[in-house]
Regions:
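Short, Lys/Arg-enriched N-terminal segments with co-localized hydrophobic residues
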Residues: 2-14
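N-terminal Rossmann-like NAD(P)+-binding subdomain of aldehyde/semialdehyde dehydrogenases
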Residues: 13-137
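Short, basic, glycine/proline-bearing loop/turn elements
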Residues: 28-30, 144, 192-196
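Active-site-adjacent beta-strand anchor residues
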Residues: 55, 173, 200
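Short acidic/polar active-site loop segments enriched in Thr and Asp
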Residues: 58, 168, 196
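Conserved small-residue-rich beta-alpha loop and adjacent elements
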Residues: 122-188
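A glycine-rich helix N-cap at a beta->alpha junction
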Residues: 186-202
Length: 202
């Protein structure tokens, strides 16, 4: 059996296609899996430090990190995306792209509807009731990357499964650009998908 996969060079258009045959797969997979879990230790400690700082100092620490990492001046007054910002985003996004997003929403919803689980109960002659109760979470948070990785699909694939499952409130966090704005297509996708609150953080 043969499999194929490819590597894309970041920042360029060079793509190397690798044929994964029985003869080559062990060597190729070994090289791909060489990265040791221990190599992530420095990142884990950095993340732990950030979490502790935010837990200790709250929003002020979050605003400081947003300034350091995203170069954006975010505070309590502008961290939540407003309806005016969403309306502006619609004016900046090509109507054809908005239509594509809407069609994608229909397709993604249809797929996840087929995965949906339902409550069921069964009564036995002796009065015993067996069953399963499926209850959606009341609230979930989703993270959507920004910058060069700002894809509307990231919004849809995070939000729509939760909506189909019956989640009542969806809160989205996404990093702003240095002007404190969120990528317009991200905002349009979030609005179309049914996100309730969007925070400029991440």
């Amino acid at each position: 059996m043969e499999f194929g996969f490819c590597f894309a060079k970041q920042g360029g258009n060079i793509m190397r296609i690798v044929e994964l045959t029985d003869e080559s797969k062990n060597n190729i997979l070994e090289n791909l899996l060489k990265r040791s879990p221990n190599s992530y230790g420095k990142f884990e400690s950095a993340v732990a430090e950030i979490l502790l700082n935010i837990k200790t100092n709250g929003d002020e620490a979050l605003f400081e990190y947003t300034k350091n990492f995203d170069k954006a001046d975010i505070n309590a007054d502008n961290i939540v995306v407003t309806e005016a910002e969403i309306e502006e985003a619609y004016s900046l996004v090509d109507p054809e792209l908005i239509e594509v997003i809407r069609k994608a929403i229909v397709n993604i919803r249809s797929f996840h509807e087929k995965q949906k689980q339902y409550s069921w109960f069964d009564s036995k002659p002796d009065g015993t009731i067996l069953g399963q109760k499926v209850t959606a979470l009341a609230r979930v948070g989703v993270y959507v990357p920004g910058g060069k990785a700002a894809y509307p699909s990231s919004v849809l694939m995070n939000v729509l499964p939760a909506k189909v499952a019956g989640v009542e409130q969806i809160i989205m966090c996404t990093p702003p650009d240095k002007e404190g704005k969120v990528y317009p297509t991200t905002l349009v996708a979030a609005k179309e998908a049914g996100v309730d609150v969007i925070y400029k953080a991440g």
